[in-house]
């Protein structure tokens, strides 16, 4: 008799995706982040669902409902901080996952890569809308500033902003629709993750060498299930340390002040995971130019496969490209730091230089270095 996991219509799909899936024998811990992201998404949906049971999306009661969750709901504070810091873990895993893709040339699987970039945009949109929900000062002003950027679009900008707001300012209608979309998007993301995996399983995983590994594959279970569990334990440990010891470390103190349209906070800034893009936005003095740079800072990932000029897929054996990659990583840390600083000298010029460097590494320096490496290897 055939094993049920190989014959049952539903079990068959799970089996071919997570159990008998052929995987390269040499993939490192950098390949753990895909499964960690799946777990992060599940955790966010679960904690978010329970938070939504107690949250009210009304300007008069939103702030108090979050306070009520923390004070009166059984383990409500755990739910709230798991959800808030879970988002931070989500983005740490996301950025490491994208970084892995850039380093090892995984972007050559263009369908998987492009769906991944769309997923990145969707997660960023979800996180932004979630940040508005507690209706603190930074929630309100963050929503006002970021949505107002759309007014830079010629001709339709102002109408578009008022349409998104549902009025002439960020108000009751805005909060309600942001809650609706914040609840809906994670399920759309989950569906897109399925498509992401579907395309990945068409080609199979890449590996650190960048060389096809069809001749040397091992089953996903038990080898990579146990390896993923180790990654999961480390991530859960980090998350619990954050939630139980310093839950507000990554948040903004201004968000403990209820939203007040008449009082602007001295420094309006988003959560830490958006600071690099915020720094790029601020480094251009023109409003429309800044908005375009902001979108391009992420959208640039779409054209990375087109800019691949090397005859090798991975950076494992390309020391010059490795230097550029780590320069790019350092540049992103610099941009993140600048995004959290006030708009004054010397932060402005540092931000502008870091923004120019970010774009030039990806568009210009990486492809040129790859060509040079080809030449050095007489290819």
From Swiss-Prot:
Keywords: Electron transport, Heme, Iron, Membrane, Metal-binding, Mitochondrion, Mitochondrion inner membrane, Respiratory chain, Transmembrane, Transmembrane helix, Transport, Ubiquinone. One of its GO terms (cellular component) is mitochondrial inner membrane. It is a multi-pass membrane protein. It comes from the Eukaryota. Pfam families: Cytochrom_B_C, Cytochrome_B. The chain crosses the membrane at residues 33-53, 77-98, 113-133, 178-198, 226-246, 288-308, 320-340, 347-367. Coiled coil: none annotated. It is found in: Mitochondrion inner membrane. Its main location: mitochondrion. Component of the ubiquinol-cytochrome c reductase complex (complex III or cytochrome b-c1 complex) that is part of the mitochondrial respiratory chain. The b-c1 complex mediates electron transfer from ubiquinol to cytochrome c. Contributes to the generation of a proton gradient across the mitochondrial membrane that is then used for ATP synthesis. This is Cytochrome b. It comes from Myotis lucifugus. The gene is MT-CYB.
């Amino acid at each position: 008799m055939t094993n049920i996991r190989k014959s049952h219509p539903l079990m068959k799909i799970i089996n071919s995706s997570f159990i008998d899936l052929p995987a390269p024998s040499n993939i490192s811990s950098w390949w753990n982040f895909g499964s960690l992201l799946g777990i992060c998404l599940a955790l966010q949906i679960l904690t978010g669902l329970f938070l939504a049971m107690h949250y009210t999306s009304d300007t008069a009661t939103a702030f108090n409902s979050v306070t009520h969750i923390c004070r009166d709901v059984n383990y409500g504070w755990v739910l709230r901080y798991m959800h808030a810091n879970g988002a931070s873990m989500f983005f740490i895993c996301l950025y490491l996952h994208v970084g892995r893709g850039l380093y090892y040339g995984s972007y050559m699987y263009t369908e998987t890569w492009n769906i991944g970039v769309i997923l990145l945009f969707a997660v960023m949109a979800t996180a932004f809308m979630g940040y508005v929900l507690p209706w603190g000062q930074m929630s309100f002003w963050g929503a006002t500033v970021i949505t107002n950027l759309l007014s830079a679009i010629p001709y339709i900008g102002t109408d578009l902003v008022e349409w998104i707001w549902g009025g002439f300012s960020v108000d009751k209608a805005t909060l309600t629709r942001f809650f609706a979309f914040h609840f809906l998007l994670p399920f759309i993301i989950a569906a897109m993750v399925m498509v992401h995996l579907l395309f990945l399983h068409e080609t199979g995983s890449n590996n650190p060498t960048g060389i096809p590994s069809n001749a040397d594959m091992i089953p996903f279970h038990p080898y990579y299930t146990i390896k993923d569990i180790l990654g999961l334990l480390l991530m859960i440990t980090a998350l619990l340390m954050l939630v139980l010891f310093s839950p507000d470390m990554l948040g903004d103190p201004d968000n403990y002040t209820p939203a007040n349209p008449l009082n602007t906070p001295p420094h309006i800034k988003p959560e830490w995971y958006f600071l690099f893009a915020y720094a790029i936005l601020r480094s251009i003095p023109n409003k429309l130019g800044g908005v375009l740079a902001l979108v391009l800072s992420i959208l640039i990932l779409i054209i990375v496969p087109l800019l691949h000029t090397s005859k090798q897929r991975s950076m494992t054996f390309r020391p010059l490209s490795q230097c550029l990659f780590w320069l790019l990583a350092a540049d992103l840390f610099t941009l993140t730091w600048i995004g959290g600083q006030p708009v004054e000298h010397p932060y402005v010029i540092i931000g502008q230089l870091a923004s120019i460097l970010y774009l030039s590494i990806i568009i210009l320096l990486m492809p040129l270095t790859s060509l040079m490496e080809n030449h050095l290897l007489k290819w």
